[in-house]
Amino acid sequence: MTLRSFLILLLSSIVLAGCSSVPESVTSVEWQAHEQRLETIDNFQATGKLGYIGPDQRQSLNFFWKHSSALSQLRLTTLLGQTALKLTITPQGATVETYDDQVLSARDANQLIYRLTGLMMPVDHLPDWLLGLPTDADSFQLSPTNTLQALDKQIGLNDWNIAYQRYGDIEWHEQTLPLPNKLRLSTSDVKINLVITKWNITQ
């Protein structure tokens, strides 16, 4: 597998983990209050490390995710700081730039991922999932501290699970807000570990 093919597979795996429908469930008042606070976040930046484990590939990368209503951007870099892949999504369209200077564009991110992987999938909910919101999930579970503990979803023939393994507190609007800082995305043959080392809520 070439590096470019691996990065496309990695990107599609991350995107796969961002799209899924939430059933009606009984939740606590504390969770509902936490969920409402998360839903007010429109602009954020997340920095961290990503580990990918597949059937024939293992890779460690740094990531930087920047999201606002006008721009969403994911940049993956090697441990030496070289940009491996950058995905940019705006209201006008989506673009992927690869380490070998190839640029691929489409009217929206769904079309771009389809062109790269042959899979049609929505990507609109990925920022919410990173924050710990169960937007459009098949099912979800809460932790004893009323944060999101796990999500389950089926996309095509694959059953995906997102486990929120650790949270960290940040100060936001003079209150303490727990945000995910360790997640595992997994299906039958792929595991993606995310460690978020820094959150920046910018509004």
From Swiss-Prot:
Q: Does the keyword Signal apply?
A: yes
Q: PROSITE patterns, per this entry?
A: PROKAR_LIPOPROTEIN
Q: Which GO terms describe its biological process?
A: lipoprotein localization to outer membrane; protein transport
Q: Where is the signal peptide?
A: 1-18
Respond yes or no to whether keyword Protein transport is given for this record: yes
User: What is the membrane topology listed in the Swiss-Prot or TrEMBL record?
Assistant: Lipid-anchor
Q: Lipid (N-palmitoyl cysteine) attached at which positions?
A: C19
InterPro entries the record matches: LolA/LolB/LppX, OM_lipoprot_LolB
Q: Where is the lipid attached (S-diacylglycerol cysteine)?
A: C19
Which compartment or compartments is the protein found in?
Cell outer membrane
**A single GO cellular-component term on record:** cell outer membrane
Q: HAMAP family recorded for this chain?
A: LolB
**Family statement:** Belongs to the LolB family.
Q: What does this protein do?
A: Plays a critical role in the incorporation of lipoproteins in the outer membrane after they are released by the LolA protein.
Instruction: State how it assembles.
Output: Monomer.
What protein is this chain from?
A: Outer-membrane lipoprotein LolB
